[in-house]
């Protein structure tokens, strides 16, 4: 074989090896991707359960907070009405009996 032919054969061999390496890398990454997807599918139910549990806890806390806010607003309303009632009685010359300590 001539030197030129040997060079061409060697170049084509190098190209073939480069292509083979590329295909091998693609296969490895594809296999890794499939493995990650399977792993994610196994982990996903647990993540969903944790997220649902967190949502339930947050909802319970939000309900409790809303209840406290509503109770405070109701207490303020009763205090305001009581003050108004006392003022009306004072204007009429009457008053509540208040025991002093």
Curated annotation (Swiss-Prot):
Keywords of the record: Cell projection, Cilium, Cytoplasm, Cytoskeleton, Flagellum
> What's in the GO CC field?
axonemal A tubule inner sheath; axonemal microtubule; sperm flagellum
Cited InterPro entries? CFAP141 (IPR029375)
Q: Does the keyword tRNA processing apply?
A: no
Checking Pfam families in the record gives: CFAP141
Its Gene Ontology biological processes?
flagellated sperm motility
- What subcellular locations does the record give? Cytoplasm, Cytoskeleton, Cilium axoneme; Cytoplasm, Cytoskeleton, Flagellum axoneme
Q: Tissue expression, per UniProt?
A: Expressed in airway epithelial cells.
Question: Its biological function?
Answer: Microtubule inner protein (MIP) part of the dynein-decorated doublet microtubules (DMTs) in cilia axoneme, which is required for motile cilia beating.
Q: How does it assemble?
A: Microtubule inner protein component of sperm flagellar doublet microtubules.
State the protein's name. Answer: Cilia- and flagella-associated protein 141
């Amino acid at each position: 074989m001539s030197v030129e032919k040997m060079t061409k054969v060697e170049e084509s061999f190098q190209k073939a090896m480069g292509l083979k390496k590329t295909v091998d890398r693609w296969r490895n990454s594809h296999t890794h991707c499939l493995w990650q997807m399977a792993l994610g599918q196994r982990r996903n139910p647990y993540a969903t359960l944790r997220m649902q549990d967190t949502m339930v806890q947050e909802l319970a806390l939000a309900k409790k907070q809303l209840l406290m806010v509503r109770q405070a607003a109701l207490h303020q309303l009763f205090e305001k009405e009581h003050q108004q009632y006392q003022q009306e009685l004072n204007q009429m010359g009457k008053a509540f009996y208040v025991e002093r300590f």
